[in-house]
């Protein structure tokens, strides 16, 4: 058994890694040591003990504008990180906080709409397209995990949300407004534009 002094640098180095990421690294190293052709079974079990970290995600304003202040107050009364998704939701959030919504144009993705910043909010993104991509990442994460190298490195809105939900959060609260976005009712647009609630429900099930 190695002395504690030699273990400490490793515990510090890998502290930010998720249990699944550590297990994957160990399995990959075993495959490497076997020269790419494992001669026996390899089993890795990883348990990560950590403090609870709450993340709150809001997408869409309420159907009744009179409920907006109540929704915003409840959302920002929760501790932890705050994610705001959707153009209208971001604008209303900026008005509620009395802060400008500043578009981020330093990182452009061909697939995901640009992010923005609002003082007091950790992540600000577009709505349905971004959450659809997060759901794709979540399904893959529970399966073959082939997209891990994408969302852990890329700086688009979907990747930033995925990192926060999959690797940082222990408790996640969703705030889903039921206001109808007229732009999403075009029958020529992909069906995912019409199922915001279903997207969030599927994502919630994946996270559980």
Model-predicted segments: where are they?
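Short, small-residue-biased leader/transition segments that mark boundaries at the very start
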Residues: 1-2, 6-13
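Alpha-helical hydrophobic/aromatic positions enriched in membrane-embedded helices and signal peptides
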Residues: 2, 33, 78-79
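Active-site beta-strand/loop microenvironment that shapes enzyme catalytic pockets
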Residues: 66, 71-97
């Amino acid at each position: 058994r190695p002395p504690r002094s030699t273990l400490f640098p490793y515990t510090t180095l890998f502290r930010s890694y998720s249990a699944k990421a550590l297990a994957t690294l160990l399995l990959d190293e075993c495959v490497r040591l076997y020269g790419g052709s494992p001669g026996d079974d390899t089993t890795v079990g990883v348990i990560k003990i950590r403090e609870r970290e709450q993340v709150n995600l809001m997408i869409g304003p309420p159907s009744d504008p009179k409920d907006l202040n109540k929704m915003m107050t409840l959302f920002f009364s929760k501790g932890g990180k705050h994610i705001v998704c959707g153009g209208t939701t971001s604008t209303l959030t900026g008005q509620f906080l009395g802060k400008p919504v500043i578009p981020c144009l330093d990182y452009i993705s061909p697939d995901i709409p640009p992010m923005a910043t609002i003082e007091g909010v950790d992540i600000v993104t577009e709505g349905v397209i971004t959450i659809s991509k997060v759901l794709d990442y979540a399904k893959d994460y529970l399966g073959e995990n082939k997209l891990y190298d994408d969302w852990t490195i890329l700086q688009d809105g979907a990747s930033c949300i995925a990192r926060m939900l999959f690797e940082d959060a222990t408790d996640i609260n969703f705030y889903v407004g039921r206001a109808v976005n007229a732009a999403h009712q075009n029958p020529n647009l992909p069906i995912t534009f019409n199922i915001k609630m279903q997207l969030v429900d599927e994502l919630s099930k994946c996270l559980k």
